[in-house]
Amino acid sequence: MYLKQNLMSYLAQAIGELKSQIHAYLQQSTNELVRFQVKLDKVDLLAWLKGQSAYPQFYLHFRDEEKALAALGAVQSFSQLNLAQEFIEESGFPLVGGLQFQGTAQFVLPKMLVEQDNKGTLVSFFVKNEQSANDTLAHLKTFENLTALSALPKQIPLHTELRANERTWCDWVNQALVEIKSGELTKIVLANETTFHLKQAINAYDFLAESEKQNQGCYHFLWAENSHSVFVGSTPERLFAREYNLLLTEALAGTASVSESEEETQSQANWLLNDEKNLKENWLVVEDISQNLRKQVESFDVSNVELKPLRKVQHLIRKIRANLTAHYADVNILKAIHPTAAVSGLPQQQAKMILSEIETFDRGWYAGTLGVMSDVCSEFCVAIRSAFIEGHRIRVFAGAGIVAGSQPLEEWKEIERKAAGLISLFAEEK
């Protein structure tokens, strides 16, 4: 166990402030939903979450700025997007959560929301009655007992199960190419699931902390509804970020390898920037997003194609900037662009139907979207490069976009490289 040296003094002051706020609230004898806020010194959010026993748990470390948030528990839950949007507009309070790949929604107003940036740490407590008001003091004291993060041990998996081995994967790709050739599809994104059975259980918080160190330039996320299955990942892809009516989104598609040789990596980068298939695959995503947002934006600007370098792979990326119409709503943006052609295909509904016929597993949260939604600003990542950690078992996902001209074996190599970003954190090669 460890504690930052000056955290105790911050906690003592914060508890005193909170007691005063709670006393004033209780004097009003109301069941109105309210927010209490206190400031703390910087806290290791993953270490804090690791020591908590309440669920659900949510964590998001943002990609493009030094900002992170963690959420614990649920005061209210929403499975209907429209009700979630109405709640935000009426209360002004934020929600965390997202959509699974197939569109199942889950958003919560947490009991505790911890927001952290380079200015400090702000803790919000959402309460709606006397009992929950009194509970906030106990919740605040949980910062006294941070559970130290541990180094992630490398181990040789006892057993590995591939949802699709190389041969089956090539069959899947060939099925997809038949659909593309027939004109049913322009693009489809196939995914694979690999399950590792381990001698030593993996702690999801230690795993994500290690991924934060090694997989830079990514969003790092965690979503857990219970202690038995924790969804984590380090994704390079933004679904969208909104501040007032300014919308930022992107097309991230097209992949090449990264090697230990700088010369080979640069050669792959040059090839990627000039490869017709990959450039087309990326542009299809741009067209899909622009088409789906056309009724919600007043202007739409697309950057030139760039490289997005990562530890194991590099991608093509085009950044998109749009001004929303006066009557924008985050839920309408979510409905319009999730899932994008970067994780599903084109046309979207046809691609999703064919994926359900080819793939032999339920994606669940994989290739879904997770984030935070509020009245002023919202941000969501695309939940790829992800895994379910389930004690002695970890299920890792990776996908590849299939278009006319795709080669099955090359696509197999691509998903192996993508999955390696997480697998290399815990698995030793035999």
Curated annotation (Swiss-Prot):
Catalytic activity field: chorismate = isochorismate
Residues that coordinate or bind Mg(2+): 281, 414
Keywords attached to this entry: Isomerase, Magnesium, Menaquinone biosynthesis, Metal-binding
Gene Ontology terms: biological process: L-tryptophan biosynthetic process; menaquinone biosynthetic process
Molecular-function GO terms, alphabetical: isochorismate synthase activity; magnesium ion binding
InterPro entries: ADC_synthase (IPR005801), Chorismate_C (IPR015890), IsoChor_synthase (IPR004561), MenF (IPR034681), MenF-like (IPR044250)
UniProt-listed Enzyme Commission number(s): 5.4.4.2
Top enzyme class: isomerase
Cofactor: Mg(2+)
This protein's pathway: Quinol/quinone metabolism; 1,4-dihydroxy-2-naphthoate biosynthesis; 1,4-dihydroxy-2-naphthoate from chorismate: step 1/7; Quinol/quinone metabolism; menaquinone biosynthesis
Catalytic machinery residues: 187, 237
Entries under Pfam families matching the protein: Chorismate_bind
Keyword Lyase: no
Origin superkingdom: Bacteria
Keyword Phosphoprotein: no
HAMAP family, alphabetized: MenF
Family the entry assigns: Belongs to the isochorismate synthase family.
Function description: Catalyzes the conversion of chorismate to isochorismate.
NCBIfam families the record matches: isochor_syn
Name the record gives this protein: Isochorismate synthase MenF
Gene that produces this protein: menF
